[in-house]
């Protein structure tokens, strides 16, 4: 799937949404749906949904920004489309932005979460990070730790990292990076909250690997080159292309400040 922002309103009222609670401890519900297009399974998800207020979050917009960021940094990741659409939930029509992505499994592959794979295969006393090193996932995990620090990903639990296995070809691989909605300023719902948000504060995050501090986890990547590409001052326009009608100027400014300041700290620490 090509990374794209679709601003022309689409009719997606045929999608059937299921309620999935956030694992990050945040209030609200995240709804998901799926369809099949040209034989390929497509997954859809909404930003934070409130039964009374409707869609109140902007997690889907975060997905497209991180998608573009990882393209710049040369990290293998799932591509998203941000779509303006009419949808139906419990008989009520909402107009909102949602995101869509294709199934990353290849034919013959099955998937399991990294936490389940770890529980089934680790040796006693082995940490999740050491297990990933032994399993050959170390480069992937090191890059992930850097990504999660840059965007302050609050929800990299063990099911947000997946292992793909093909029993017929006896192959094993780790899935592209995905699911970055609970990042940046995702829990800010007003301009006052956005403008006062401390972009460098080391908040507690739901990490499967390492500690709950994304900053502390940088110790694992000291002296390592984790990105093939770079983030430069000229990349701002690319990151926020077609988003100026969706996010406020101050919101984009705070995200950009977070990325540039954390990118500076990241480079100083590794």
Named regions from a protein language model:
Residues 91-95, 100-145, 245, 265-266:
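ATP-dependent phospho-/nucleotidyl transfer catalytic cores
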Residues 167-270:
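C-terminal catalytic region of ATP-dependent kinase domains
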Residues 10-20, 130-146, 188-192, 205-217:
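A short, terminal or domain-edge coil/loop segment
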Residues 43, 79-81, 158, 174-177, ...:
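A structural signal for short, well-ordered beta-strand segments and their strand-loop junctions
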Residues 124-189:
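Conserved kinase catalytic-core segment
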Residues 68-72, 143, 147, 257, ...:
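A broad, structural surface signal
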Residues 2-112:
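Conserved ATP-binding subdomain of kinase catalytic cores across diverse folds
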Residues 57, 135, 249, 253:
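Charge-dense, low-complexity intrinsically disordered segments
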């Amino acid at each position: 799937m090509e990374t794209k922002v679709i601003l022309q309103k689409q009719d997606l009222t045929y999608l059937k949404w299921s309620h999935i609670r956030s694992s990050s401890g945040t209030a609200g519900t995240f709804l998901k749906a799926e369809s099949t297009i040209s034989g390929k399974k497509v997954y859809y998800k909404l930003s934070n949904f409130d039964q009374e207020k409707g869609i109140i979050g902007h997690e889907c917009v975060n997905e497209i920004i991180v998608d573009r960021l990882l393209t710049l940094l040369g990290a293998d990741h799932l591509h998203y489309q941000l779509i303006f659409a009419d949808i139906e939930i419990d008989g009520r029509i909402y107009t909102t932005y949602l995101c869509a992505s294709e199934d990353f499994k290849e034919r013959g592959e099955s998937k399991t979460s990294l936490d389940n794979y770890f529980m089934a295969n680790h040796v006693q006393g082995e940490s999740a990070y050491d297990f990933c090193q032994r399993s050959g996932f170390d480069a992937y995990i090191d890059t992930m730790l850097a990504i999660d620090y840059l965007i302050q990903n609050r929800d990299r639990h063990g099911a947000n990292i997946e292992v793909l296995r093909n029993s017929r070809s006896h192959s094993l691989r780790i899935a592209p990076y995905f699911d970055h909605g609970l990042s940046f300023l995702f829990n800010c719902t007003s301009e006052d909250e956005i403008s006062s948000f401390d972009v460098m504060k080391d908040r507690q995050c739901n990490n499967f690997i390492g500690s709950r501090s994304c900053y502390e986890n940088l110790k694992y990547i000291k002296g390592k080159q984790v990105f093939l590409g770079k983030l430069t001052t000229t990349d701002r326009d690319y990151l926020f292309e077609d988003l100026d009608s969706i996010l406020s100027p101050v919101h984009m400014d705070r995200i950009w400040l977070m990325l540039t300041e954390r990118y500076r700290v990241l480079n100083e620490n590794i």
